């Protein structure tokens, strides 16, 4: 068994304003006051401190009372034998444990209802159809953030936030799965459970750091019995085990407490560490001061004792709480990914934050100063939280890691549900992970990254369909003869009639995807694109489309949008229009790629410059009734479209076959 010699048992140096209760168990290791003073560092940006949010005793009661946690669940997904698990209905009950809310550092789920009775009469067939076939998800229950992804001894490892008891948030445990190819997965036993005072209310989000000698360090946030967010250390019990089945929590956890000036519920989600020129490791942790989102900086040599730096890595006023911060380098000249510690000429750094206030992931490109441990955005107008988003749809708490096996940086993201919690309870599961994406610097624009599905997903492609140079006149609709449209990989390009475009002097210069009428709103130069998950009478449809706006100066701006407003006849689902503008360079065709997997549509424009993830819950356009159409709803321009589509096989997701070892 491997031992971690860099993890000696000793007192911790805590820069903390938090002190455990006097009646805490003897197993707790309280900070040494003298040592604590040594590392107390004032944060220069802090002029005033918000008091911690009041934690209601009623919430605590609900969380710990097992009787209350028994919530009606009527599961309709299939078991491993293909049998329907839904045998009988139960009368609606009041929901037990509430969703993780602002008091615990995370916003409520959208469309939360007071009872388990859905407002729409979902059938078993409808709910069963919603389960994806080639996206990662547990066999049942709730999942959220991806955690600590890494590659070890031939296996990709994914850990994730998981509730083993219900399809709603609670009792957060680290699920664990492995894969050879990032597509087909084997479920393993839980990696870590909430069983210590420092994580009894949840083993929250964390990151893995693979050291130069191959050792693995896992830092994660624990929610203590006092509902205080602290950082903890864990490591594999046996590094020679390719499955990494057993994890040891460091005996002297926590290794970091909320520092002075930081609220006890505003300190979470440590990043992967990177090593500086001084030989010390750095990590950053998201937080806030008033309405300013910040990224705290720490140094360590052994991952046990930490020095809080005077300066912040970065801060952006008005962005609120930063969580799930990610920080990594990208090459501006090469096509490979970079290890997190790489810096120097030809390198830019991506800083990404998940904003708790609006539940979106924002990123910016910039320069990292390793001497002063400061990051500066290339364009302050596109700073973190006010500029570019990783994904303009339902996508949150994303996490990258460096795949040393294939020299690429890979991105995971949590795709939550946008139906009601009561519907989630009926189907017995909630949330999936995105298809992993490669991340590279866009050398053509120099202003953004490119995200693209990993090549391994193409192994699921089967029967193909291709159509070239189809003219779409204004107002036209062309069905594509695809027999099964619930699992598709679609690549399409569009050419706008050049003469008509040049003859248009002004067209919807103030267009905005989210404030528009969606694909039904007709303009001179758009919308045009693809309808997926549509039925023949078009009573349900999900358009993904381009829309070109042109100002009086002749400059055009292209938008990429996904319209959910008519995606379902159900009333208790999200029906927003998502999207944003997408850079289109001179000579480029308009291009999109869509991954359709039942209730998920992941859409990529212009090679991944703009990405949108949609959750849709059709009631009619399901199974054999699902169709695909090309459309052009513009009033003043014809479009020529070419499409290639593949039906996608289902990925394998099953328990690891321990009985075959």
From Swiss-Prot:
Residues noted as binding substrate in the record, renumbered to the chain: 142-145, 161, 169, 204-205, 268-269, 323, 356
GO cellular component: membrane; vacuolar lumen
Outcome of substituting residue 210 to I: In class 2 and class 3
Cytoplasmic side: 1-44
Keywords assigned: Disulfide bond, Glycoprotein, Glycosidase, Hydrolase, Membrane, Signal-anchor, Transmembrane, Transmembrane helix, Vacuole, Zymogen
Post-translational modifications: N-glycosylated; high-mannose and high-xylose complex glycans.
Residues carrying sugar: 171, 238, 290, 512, 633
Keyword tRNA processing recorded: no
Effect caused by changing residue 277 to P: In class 2 and class 3
Biased composition (Basic and acidic residues): 23-37
Organism domain of life: Eukaryota
Cysteine disulfide links: 513-561
More details: There are at least three isozymes of beta-fructofuranosidase in carrot: one insoluble and two soluble ones.
Subunit field text: Monomer. May be present in two forms, a 70 kDa monomer and a heterodimer of the 30 kDa and 38 kDa subunits. The ratio of the levels of the two forms within cells appears to be regulated developmentally.
Protein name (record): Beta-fructofuranosidase, soluble isoenzyme I
Species assigned in the record: Daucus carota
High-level lineage: Eukaryota, Viridiplantae, Streptophyta, Embryophyta, Tracheophyta
Gene: INV*DC4
């Amino acid at each position: 068994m491997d031992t971690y010699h860099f993890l000696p048992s000793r007192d911790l140096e805590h820069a903390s304003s938090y002190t455990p209760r006097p009646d805490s168990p003897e197993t707790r290791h309280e900070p040494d006051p003298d040592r604590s003073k040594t590392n107390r560092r004032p944060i220069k940006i802090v002029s005033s401190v918000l008091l911690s949010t009041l934690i209601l005793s009623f919430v605590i009661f609900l969380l710990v009372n097992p009787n209350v946690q028994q919530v009606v669940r009527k599961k309709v997904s299939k078991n491993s034998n293909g049998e329907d698990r839904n045998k009988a209905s139960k009368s609606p009950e009041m929901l037990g444990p509430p969703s993780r809310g602002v008091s615990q550092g995370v916003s409520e789920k959208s469309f939360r209802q007071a009872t388990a009775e859905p407002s729409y009469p979902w059938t078993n067939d409808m709910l069963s159809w919603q389960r994806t076939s080639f996206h990662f998800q547990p066999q049942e229950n709730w999942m959220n953030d991806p955690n600590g992804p890494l590659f070890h001894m031939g296996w990709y490892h994914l850990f994730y936030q998981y509730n083993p008891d219900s399809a709603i948030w609670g009792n957060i445990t680290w699920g664990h799965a492995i894969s050879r190819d990032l597509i087909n997965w084997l479920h393993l036993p839980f990696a870590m459970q909430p069983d210590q005072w420092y994580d009894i209310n949840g083993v929250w989000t964390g990151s893995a750091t693979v050291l130069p000698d191959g050792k693995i360090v896992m830092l994660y946030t624990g929610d203590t019995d006092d509902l205080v967010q602290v950082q903890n250390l864990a490591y594999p019990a046996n590094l020679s085990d390719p499955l990494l089945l057993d994890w040891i929590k460091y005996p002297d956890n926590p290794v970091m407490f909320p520092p002075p000036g930081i609220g006890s519920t505003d300190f979470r989600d440590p990043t992967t560490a990177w090593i500086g020129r001084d030989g010390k490791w750095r990590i950053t942790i998201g937080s806030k001061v008033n309405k300013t989102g910040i990224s705290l900086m720490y140094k360590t040599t052994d991952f046990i004792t930490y020095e809080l730096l005077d300066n912040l890595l970065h801060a952006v006023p008005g962005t609120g709480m930063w969580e799930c911060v990610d920080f990594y380098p990208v090459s501006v000249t090469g096509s490979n990914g970079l290890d997190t510690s790489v810096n120097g000429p030809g390198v830019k750094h991506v800083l990404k934050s998940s904003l708790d206030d609006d539940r979106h992931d924002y990123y910016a490109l910039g320069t990292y100063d390793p001497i002063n441990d400061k990051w500066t955005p290339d364009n302050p107008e596109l700073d973190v939280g006010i500029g570019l988003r990783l994904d303009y749809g339902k996508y949150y708490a994303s996490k990258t890691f460096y795949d040393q096996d294939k020299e690429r940086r890979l991105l995971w993201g949590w795709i939550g549900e946008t139906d009601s919690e009561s519907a989630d309870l009926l189907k017995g599961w909630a949330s999936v992970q995105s298809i992993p994406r490669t991340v590279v610097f866009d050398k053509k624009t120099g202003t953004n990254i490119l995200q693209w599905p990993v090549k391994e997903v193409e192994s699921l492609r089967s029967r193909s369909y291709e159509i070239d140079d189809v003219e779409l006149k204004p107002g036209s609709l062309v069905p594509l003869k695809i027999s099964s449209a619930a699992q598709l990989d679609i690549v399409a390009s569009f050419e706008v009639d050049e003469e008509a475009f040049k003859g248009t002097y002004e067209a919807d210069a103030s267009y905005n995807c989210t404030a528009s009428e969606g694909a039904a709103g007709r303009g001179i130069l758009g919308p045009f694109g693809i309808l997926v998950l549509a039925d023949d009478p078009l009573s349900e449809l999900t358009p993904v489309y381009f829309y070109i706006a042109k100002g009086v100066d002749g400059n055009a701006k292209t938008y990429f949008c996904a319209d959910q407003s008519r995606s379902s006849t159900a009333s208790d689902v999200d029906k927003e229009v998502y999207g944003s503008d997408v850079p289109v360079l001179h000579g480029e065709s308009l291009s999109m790629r869509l991954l359709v997997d039942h209730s998920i549509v992941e859409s990529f424009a212009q090679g991944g410059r703009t990405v949108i993830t949609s959750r849709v819950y059709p009631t009619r356009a399901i199974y054999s009734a699902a169709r695909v159409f090309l459309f052009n709803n513009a009033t003043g321009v014809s479009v020529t479209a070419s499409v290639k589509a593949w039906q996608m096989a289902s990925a394998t997701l099953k328990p690891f076959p321990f009985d075959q070892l």
